[in-house]
UniProtKB/Swiss-Prot annotation:
Similarity comment text for this entry: Belongs to the EssC family.
Stretches in topological domain Cytoplasmic: 1-229, 280-1479
CDD domains assigned: TrwB_TraG_TraD_VirD4
Main location: membrane
GO terms, molecular function: ATP binding; DNA binding
Cleavable signal peptide: none
Gene: essC
Residue intervals passing through the bilayer: 230-252, 257-279
Name of this protein: Type VII secretion system protein EssC
Residues noted as binding ATP in the record, renumbered to the chain: 672-679, 1014-1021
Domain spans labelled FtsK: 652-846, 997-1183
GO cellular component, one term: plasma membrane
Pfam families per the UniProt record, alphabetical: FtsK_SpoIIIE, FtsK_SpoIIIE_N
Region (Required for substrate secretion, protein missing this segment is unstable), start-end ranges: 1-189
Length: 1479
């Protein structure tokens, strides 16, 4: 390794150079080294000789370059420049300088620097650096302004080209000049990065010093020696009395010898009595002395035995509960005792409170004498010994966190110190895998516990955050997750309680609450107020006084002072045991925490079975070409064996799965919970089979109920013959139908070749006798539990089919996450092999393996293979095919140069920009091994031109089908002069029974009229679009006429410009529809006459007979439901009944859509020969449309079911493919324009309809209105029926009426449009009592509006008539306009005869008269003159509904609409027609 020091403009940087890498130095933040104001970019790289260069200039120790502000100095250090020296052992000051007397002599230095205070570095962690003002000193690459600075252990110092690193035992030095020193050299090698496992820690076997537990019994003293209580006089007096009596007898009666005998005997008796007394007394005293001596010796031995036991107990306690200072040594030396306690140990979660007189671990048994009248000192001695060893004095007092909540009371700062001791003890002896801490504390107390952040136990790994809750944010961030964790543990205990199994939860959570206010309003309070020990959670409460503690606290510790504490209760029992807390003032708590933070605890040694193995590693290859797939296909034969590698039992120990019927197969189960590698093991097995067997020998049908994830991975694999995803009821039955069709096909082929097993067939195929490949078909369901739940009938049939298909080469592999309740007897009995990965619980493991082993698996991909009844039962690691495939064998290494800060929550927070430079490079996307192998197999398949196997399972109908994919759509190629029979290509049909998908074609002659029933939004309009364009593309506009009735949402409007379309109707165009009905009736009658005339039965026969072109008529109705309750319902339905009954022979065909079958009347519905059902919300409605169906209609837009013997399912075609550059309407317009431009013949006539607005000026020139006026008529508007010009003949009398004067004024305006022409032809006289013609008073010959003037007009009219009768017609005719006829009569009292003469004779003589008036006034008047005029006039314009007028008696019109503005009825010859006046 090389180190490079870069110095520029008082900036100092160091770079560790790695061989083969390149580096940049610039002022850009993304560079490897950033130097402000550098002004250039320096590239560092090695040349072919390994020499480091800066911009192609070699760095030979020192390279100086000119910079913008200062010289750029590059200093390169190598291994040869490294040295390490110990501090002086006696003095506390050393010097580094150029002088011979310096402790470390470096000639290149200009001035010396002083290093001091290194003797106390172990405690202080730093030394002091002293230098003069002329020397630049950098500490951690920052220039120091002070002359005395602290440098901590690990800090780097740079002085005049010399690099120093402060260590606890000395200095590491990098100098390109010789370093001379008498100091002890520590090492000659430059320290490199430590090995990967330098900080890994493995538990050593634990040494446990048990506390003595054998009972020690103090026996009672032996029974006291019984003292002879006989007094000496009792022995002496009887013989003395005898002597006395003998003497008396002798005195009374001397008897010589007898007396001597009696006296002798008595004397002897006295002597022996005295002797016996004193000997017995002596013996008693000796026995008493011996008893006391022996028992005291016994007590002395017992005392030693007890003392030894107490010492053993004290040693055990002191060993297992050392002082914090001793713990520091344990941690510092990385002693094997670290993390020695596990949840299975007796002292798990035990810690020391302090020093106290503790209870003995053994029982001292002594039975005190209950009652004794005489005091025995030996009993007192025994009792004294028993009472002396009541406690073990000055021994560690132990508390534990296993038996309910505990609480500390007292001064908070004292309690925090006790909690710190507890933290240190528990953290040192318990692994962070087994124990975690959570502190809920006040924010001002966090600083006190800040040192503990280094403890790995303070990180809650499940939440990836430090276990400190001290404000609202941390509370919400942590406690909610903890609440969920507690809830899950409680639920787990409840579930396991049924089986009486104990659960040990890991990690144990020590939940310390020093501030209840933070959780008082949180849901976790529910659990804090109960004992959570059973769930692996230890609660510790901190309060000032005992009264504030929760009631469920079991152990209470009172910290009275730094030297006194009291264990008040323990596990709810009063103990009141005082203890002395340990003093830890001189212990560096953070040092202990930091040392523990460096340890990576590895719980278990690595198993012989690898934790993971990639697919290619299992095959011992690096590149897919090395798999030798072609040779494997050539050599492997399925009828011999189907064994393929699946994983490894250990190094180079391959485990193979062989689904040959006589080995592990043919069917099996796979179980594994989420994340266990279940899908991956299936993928590896599929891939392994594909590598080893030819596509004609092995094929896969995947059922991926979760949504097609696995199916997508293998979509390019030639062995894949089908995928079944997201099955609903219909798709399930369709799939089953397809599989059964495949079985029938295989049975047929077996019969043709006289074999009964697939192995025999494969032999014939290899020999070339059989020509159609028939591979083993592996049906694999990735999540059959859900499939079985949703589609139980399908699952049952699938298992049954697989059982039947054993000899036909059908293999069924079922995979599930949770086998419990899913694997029934039928599935179990048909599954010879079982693969069990990690499952959720023991019940699941027992369900699939009949053992609980799989519940203990922890690694993804680790699995058990069980075949039969434990014929094979092996644990192995399955291969992983999702690994990145790098053909060059080098993993893409991207160095992340982001600098992260560990924030207060223990989480990483980026504090600089991303310096990786990836934003400037194109990210390389590597293939997975699975993708690489599939691509390799695909390339082999293409190269060898392997014929695809016929697929037993055709994919579900696509959601988009296009007409151009089904049939020719270029109208230029299809239009011809020859009349063709109509064929309709409706879409793509699906016939799983025949394993066929193809165009859905209807012969119109056979299909008849078509009714499509479906819910709105499922493609009904698209169905009509498809038919419209299909017809238009195959037939010229003169061969096919289309009438579009759009009763929906204007869906047919975009196609109205197709030249074949005669007209377009909407539901509110009642009049237009009425016209169409009349036209259809006329056309039916016309065609029927043709048939009758030529004596043929159909128009097609007529065409063949005559060669005439009579177009097909297509009536297309969208949303027939709208006909109901419409104003034209009755007439329209009657028309459609007639059309569907008679139209087919007349080449008039109806196609309609509706949302329900009963939208049509029964006679019409019966005539609809072809009925199609789309998706319907009411499922029963489908049966009404197509009858009993095998498959329901899927809830997919465009999916439909055709009524036929087999009820064929199909997907409706679309006229155009989706084009990103054009909208659908643009595509329609383009084709319509092309058709219009291409076709120059006749197109169908549309239905003439009244425009919304007709202005006189718009029609003046086109209809030549001035000439019409000049020829003696008034053009007034257009009629609604034929939209032709309507006029009032001035040569005949006429009457115009309306409902209001405003309409009369409008009529006057239209009548006077050509006033100049009228004046040329007529002498115009107007009697206008109501003033509507007032605007023209000066433009006519005579105008009267006053009563007298009106009378004058009357006289003029009579005189004019008389004069013309006498003289004949004048050169200029007269035109009399009588406005307000009623008032005219009232003013003039014109006789009836005059009225008759004016009407009958006037026109002949050139006197023309026009009556105008308000309809109601004309009707209500009782003037006979009006009645006469009405009866004699044959021209009327009535501005009122026919049903409301009373001039004529016409048949009542049902629901006649209200007359709109400018509308009227023209009545002539007892017939009427509706018109609209010009504007």
């Amino acid at each position: 390794m090389h180190k490079l020091i870069i110095k520029y403009n008082k900036q100092l940087k160091m770079l560790n150079l790695r061989d083969g890498k390149t580096y940049t130095i610039s002022e850009d933040e993304r560079a490897d080294i950033t130097l402000k104001s550098l002004g250039e970019v320096i590239h560092l790289e090695q040349n072919n000789q390994g020499t480091w260069q800066a911009n192609h200039t070699s760095i030979n120790k020192v390279l100086v370059r000119k910079g913008d502000l200062d010289d750029i100095t590059l200093q390169l250090y190598t291994e040869a420049d490294y040295a390490s020296f110990a501090y002086p052992s006696i003095q506390d000051t050393m010097t580094i300088g150029p002088n011979a007397y310096d402790d470390m002599v470096i000639q290149s230095l200009m001035n010396a620097i002083i290093i001091k205070d290194f003797q106390s570095i172990q405690e202080s962690q730093y030394v002091r650096i002293v230098h003069d003002k002329n020397t630049d000193v950098y500490i951690n690459y920052e220039l120091q302004e002070q002359l005395t600075n602290k440098a901590y252990i690990g800090d780097h110092i740079y002085v005049e080209g010399i690099w120093l690193e402060v260590q606890a035992d000395g200095l590491n030095v990098l100098s390109q000049n010789t370093v001379a020193s008498s100091l002890i050299r520590l090492t000659q090698e430059m320290p490199h990065a430590q090995a990967d496992d330098y900080n890994t820690y493995h538990r050593s076997p634990r040494i446990i010093h048990r506390e003595p537990t054998d009972d020690i019994k103090i026996e009672r003293p032996p029974q006291p020696i019984q003292k002879n209580n006989t007094v000496i006089w009792r022995s002496i007096i009887p013989p003395l009395v005898m002597i006395a009596l003998t003497v008396v007898i002798f005195l009374v009666r001397p008897i010589g010898i007898y007396i001597l005998m009696m006296i002798g005997m008595s004397t002897v008796t006295i002597v022996f009595g005295i002797t016996t007394y004193f000997s017995e007394k002596k013996k008693y005293n000796k026995d008493v002395e011996k008893r006391e001596k022996d028992y005291k010796a016994y007590l002395d031995n017992k005392s030693k035995e007890i003392n030894k036991a107490i010492k053993a107990q004290r040693f055990s306690l002191n060993y297992h509960y050392p002082t914090v200072a001793e713990i520091k040594d344990i941690v510092e030396t990385k002693a094997p005792r670290i993390y020695e306690k596990t949840s299975h140990h007796h002292d798990f979660l035990h810690y020391k409170l302090g020093i106290a007189n503790v209870e003995k671990s053994f029982k001292l048994d002594y039975q005190e004498e209950e009652f004794n009248q005489r005091r025995d000192e030996l009993f007192d001695d025994a009792k004294e010994l028993y009472e002396f060893y009541t406690d073990v004095e000055q021994a560690p007092l132990i508390n534990d966190l296993n038996h309910g909540p505990i609480a500390y009371i007292g001064a908070r700062h004292l309690i925090l110190e006790e909690l710190e001791k507890m933290l240190i003890q528990l953290s040192t002896f318990h692994s962070y895998h087994d124990l975690e801490f959570l502190f809920v504390t006040r924010e001002d107390e966090v600083e006190t516990l800040k040192w503990a952040r280094w403890l790995p136990h303070m990180t809650l790994r499940g939440q990836n955050i430090r276990g400190f809750v001290y404000n609202q944010r941390t509370r919400d961030q942590i406690l909610t997750s903890i609440y969920s964790m507690i809830k899950e543990r409680i639920q787990a205990v409840r579930e396991r309680s049924r089986s009486n199994e104990q659960i040990i939860f890991t990690p144990q959570l020590v939940f310390v609450i020093t501030d209840m206010s933070l959780i008082i309003d949180h849901v976790i309070l529910e659990y804090v107020n109960q004992d959570l020990s059973e769930y692996g959670i230890s609660l510790i409460f901190v309060e000032d006084v005992i009264e504030s503690l929760p009631e469920h606290v079991d152990t209470i510790i009172d910290i009275k002072s730094r030297t006194e504490g009291e264990l008040i209760t323990k596990e709810k029992e009063l103990v009141q045991l005082k203890f002395t807390p340990e003093n830890i003032d001189n212990v560096d708590k953070e040092y202990i925490a930091r040392r523990l933070a460096n340890l990576i605890h590895v719980e278990h040694l690595k198993n012989a079975i690898p934790d993971s193995i990639t697919f290619l590693e299992m095959y011992n290859v690096k590149e897919v070409d090395q798999l030798d797939v072609v040779n494997r296909w050539r050599q492997n034969e399925t009828y011999k064996t189907m064994a393929v590698p699946l994983g490894v039992r250990g190094k180079d120990d391959i485990l193979s799965l062989n689904l040959h019927e006589k080995a592990h197969g043919p069917h099996g189960l796979v179980a594994g919970t989420t994340g266990s590698g279940k899908s991956e093991i299936i993928q590896s097995y599929i891939l392994s089979l594909a590598i080893n067997f030819h596509p004609h020998e092995v094929a896969f049908l995947l059922i991926d109920y979760k949504g097609g994830g696995m199916a997508n991975l293998f979509k390019d694999l030639v062995h894949l013959v089908g995928t079944i995803t997201n099955l609903d009821g219909d798709e399930a039955m369709r799939a089953l139908t397809s599989i059964k069709a495949e079985l029938r096909k295989r049975q047929r082929l077996f019969g043709e070749h006289d074999v009964n097993h697939i192995n025999q067939y494969h032999k014939l195929f290899k020999e070339g006798i059989a020509t159609e490949p028939m591979p083993h078909l592996f049906i694999i369901s990735d999540e059959f539990a859900e499939l079985k739940s949703e589609q139980p009938d399908f699952m049952k049939e699938l298992v049954s089919t697989a059982r039947i298909g054993r000899s036909l080469g059908i293999h069924l592999i079922l995979a599930t996450q949770k086998p419990s309740g899913v694997v029934d007897d039928q599935i179990w009995s048909n599954s010879k092999f079982k693969l069990a990965l990690k499952v959720q619980d023991r019940q699941d493991s027992n369900e699939i393996l009949k053992t609980p082993d799989a519940a203990d698996i922890t690694l993804p991909g680790r699995a058990y293979l069980q075949v039969g009844n434990n014929e094979i039962y092996e644990l192995f690691q399955s291969a992983w095919s999702g690994a990145t495939y790098d053909i060059e064998g080098d993993k893409l290494e991207v160095e992340d140069k982001t600098i992260y800060m560990i924030n207060d929550y223990g989480q990483l927070q980026a504090i600089n920009k991303d310096l990786s430079g990836l934003e400037d490079e194109e990210t390389k996307e590597n293939q997975t091994e699975l993708e690489a192998v599939i691509d390799h197999i695909e390339s082999i398949t293409t190269r060898l031109e392997i014929e695809e196997v016929k697929r037993p399972w055709l994919p579900p109908l696509p959601e988009n089908v296009y007409q151009e994919d089904l049939v020719e759509t270029d109208f230029r190629k299809l239009w011809s002069d020859d009349a063709k029979e109509v064929e309709l290509t409706l879409g793509l049909k699906d016939v799983p029974e025949e394993q066929y998908q193809g165009p859905m074609v209807l012969q119109l002659k056979k299909a008849g009229h078509i009714a499509l029933i479906g819910s709105p939004g499922y493609g009904r309009t698209t169905f009509l679009h498809n038919i419209i364009f299909d017809v238009a593309r195959h037939h010229r506009p003169d061969q096919a006429h289309m009438y579009l009735f759009d009763f929906g949402t204007n869906g047919l409007m975009p196609v109205t410009d197709i030249p074949h379309v005669a007209d377009y109707f909407t539901v509110d165009q009642e009049d237009k529809i009425a016209k169409a009905i009349r036209i259809f009736n006329d056309e039916i009658d016309r065609r029927k006459k043709i048939l009758s005339q030529y004596r043929v039965t159909s128009i097609s026969e007529y065409r063949k007979l005559t060669g005439e072109t009579i177009p097909h008529v297509f009536i297309l109705i969208d949303n027939f439901d709208a006909v109901k309750d419409s104003p034209f319902q009755e007439v329209f339905e009657n028309m459609m009944i007639k059309m569907t009954r008679e139209g087919l022979a007349l080449d008039m065909q109806v196609t309609l859509t509706a949302s329900r079958a009963n939208a049509m009347k029964t006679p019409m519905y019966i005539n609809m020969k072809t009925r199609i059902a789309m998706f319907l919300y009411d499922k029963s409605e489908v049966s009404n449309v197509v009858g009993q169906q095998k498959f329901a209609v899927k809830d997919v837009v465009g999916r439909a079911l055709l009524s036929s013997d087999d009820n064929v399912s199909f997907h409706i075609g679309q006229p155009f493919k989706h084009d990103e550059t054009k909208s659908y309407n643009d595509q329609i317009n383009d084709e319509v324009s092309a058709m219009t431009e291409f076709y120059k013949g006749e197109t169908p006539n549309d239905i003439p309809m009244m425009p919304d607005e007709i202005k006189y000026e718009d029609y003046r020139e086109s209809l030549n209105l001035p000439d019409i006026v000049a020829n003696g008529a008034l053009p007034i508007g257009l009629d609604y029926e034929g939209v032709t010009l309507q006029k009032i003949k001035l040569t005949e009398p006429a009457m115009i009426s309306s409902e209001n004067p405003r309409e009369i004024a409008h009529i006057a305006e239209i009548m006077m449009k050509e006033i100049d022409i009228l004046n040329e032809k007529y002498a115009i006289c107007i009697a206008d009592s109501s003033g509507e013609f007032k605007a023209y008073r000066h433009q006519v010959a005579n105008f009267a509006e006053e009563r007298e003037d009106i009378k004058a007009i009357h006289q003029l009219m009579i005189e004019d008539l008389k004069q013309r009768e006498m003289d004949g017609p004048f050169e200029k005719d007269s035109l009399y306009i009588i406005n307000d006829f009623k008032t005219f009569i009232d003013c003039t009292y014109i006789p009836e005869d005059d009225v008759k003469k004016l009407i009958t004779k006037g026109p002949e003589l050139g006197l023309n008269i026009l009556f105008v008036g308000i309809h109601k006034e004309l009707i209500d008047a009782y003037d006979k003159q009006i009645d006469v005029a009405r009866k004699m006039i044959n021209q009327f314009s009535i501005g009122i509904r026919i049903s409301d007028q009373q001039f004529f008696k016409f048949r009542f019109i049902q629901r006649e609409p209200v007359i709109k503005e400018n509308e009227a009825y023209m009545v002539a010859n007892q017939a009427y027609q509706k018109i609209r006046w010009f504007k």
